[in-house]
């Protein structure tokens, strides 16, 4: 089975049979909790294209990752803090759930290459373009990784706004509160240039797509907030 290397870690590129069953069970549990405990509502699922694609949600709470379990049924891939992989068992569980490690605060070339490999293998990827949890209702400057990876692979980027997750589980909160959450999905942003995957990624195009993504994420967040 093919693996991808990120730092000291080696992660399976494609899921094993056990991974698929484990992810399906875990996603079902998460979706049930989202809909029952958080009364989660998802708007715009019909706009999600065929895989591979990049889901690009706003990030106000640790719950945002779990909300993705109600957005898309098949297995998603995520980046996570490399410190979470320090314990072998935890790393195996996270890998089965679609995670792979990234060193926070560094220009991690291996992590970028891993994202490209995931998308080129036909799997969908979740990236938080804000980079870390933010506060407030304004989607400010984004990191340009989503645009770069999208251009590198031709994968469309799906802007998502999540409202209510910060009320349910803000920074420092250990036990989530049963507050309503709304997820709004906007139409995908194409990363093709003249209908083709870019042979070379132009900085101007990265900036253009990043700005378009920021505006669309803001619209999605505002709509989600309105629907709370």
Residue ranges of each PLM-predicted region?
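A transmembrane-helix-recognition feature enriched in membrane-embedded lipid enzymes
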Residues: 2-43, 47, 87-97
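Short, basic, glycine/proline-bearing loop/turn elements
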Residues: 29-30, 96-102, 129-133
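Catalytic core of membrane glycerolipid acyltransferases/transacylases, capturing the structured
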Residues: 36, 47-106, 114
